[in-house]
Swiss-Prot record:
InterPro entries: UPF0319. It comes from Salmonella arizonae (strain ATCC BAA-731 / CDC346-86 / RSK2980). Residues 1-20 form the signal peptide. Keywords: Signal. This is UPF0319 protein YccT. The keyword Signal applies. The lineage of its organism: Bacteria, Pseudomonadati, Pseudomonadota, Gammaproteobacteria, Enterobacterales. Belongs to the UPF0319 family.
Length: 220
């Protein structure tokens, strides 16, 4: 796909007005999966927010925060993976609101009974369904996209079956510009679908940076 064609494609198919909800990111929340798709850490690095369309959404995340130990020591607390489902139909902004997590006792309570709220732009609670994602993988590195698919097929508290179908891995699709240009014809639709998806999630500044980068890439 030539750079000019890529830019035109994004401009035609991805108008800014399609977005209706801004998910404000938090440096104490590690976002793992969004709507059944693994989130690329490199894509979110430095971003303050993600743009979402109106409708149901599902996040898989971990809370990561430094907590106090005895004396003046600290350690990094990492929560179990959590699944949180919600609807943005009437919401223009979504913010994370975490309970107090300052010491080992509070961390243990959170592990046993996680409490995490989402607030709208007026600091009002958004109805959510929250659950712990129990992973079945014994691998050293857990594939949270696969675990989320399994969860969504199991009719659990925060399951959303519409997000159970996994698409292509975005890290392999977007890792190199030549990979975008050399995709076989039969995969072109999937490539465009994946590009559209991740471009939609990026905030306006990230989209602008991507378009500037695309313009500088040599045509094939």
């Amino acid at each position: 796909m030539k750079t000019g064609a890529l830019t035109t494609f994004l401009a035609l198919y991805l108008p800014v007005t399609v977005f209706a909800t801004t998910l404000r990111l938090s440096n104490e929340v590690d976002l793992l999966v969004l709507d059944g798709k693994r989130v690329s850490g490199s894509l979110l690095r430095g971003a303050d927010s993600i743009e979402l369309e109106n409708g149901p959404h599902q996040l898989v995340l971990r809370v990561e925060k430094n907590i106090r130990l005895s004396g003046n020591e600290e350690r990094l607390y990492i929560s179990p993976p959590l699944v949180i489902s919600f609807d943005t139909q009437q919401t223009s902004q979504v913010n994370f609101h975490l309970p107090r997590l300052e010491n080992e006792r509070e961390a243990s309570h959170f592990n046993a009974a996680p409490r995490l709220m989402l607030l709208d732009g007026d600091a009002m609670p958004i109805p959510v369904k929250l659950d712990i994602l129990t992973t079945t993988s014994t691998a050293k590195v857990v594939d949270y996209e696969i675990e989320t698919e399994r969860y969504n097929k199991s009719a659990k508290r925060a399951s959303l079956p519409q997000f159970a179908t996994i698409m292509a891995n975005d890290s392999t699709l977007l890792s190199d510009a030549s990979e975008l240009d050399a995709v076989p014809p039969q995969s072109q639709t999937l490539t465009e679908q994946r590009l559209k998806h991740w471009f939609r999630l990026a905030d306006p500044q990230t989209r602008s940076h991507f378009l500037q980068w695309a313009e500088k890439q040599p045509s094939s």
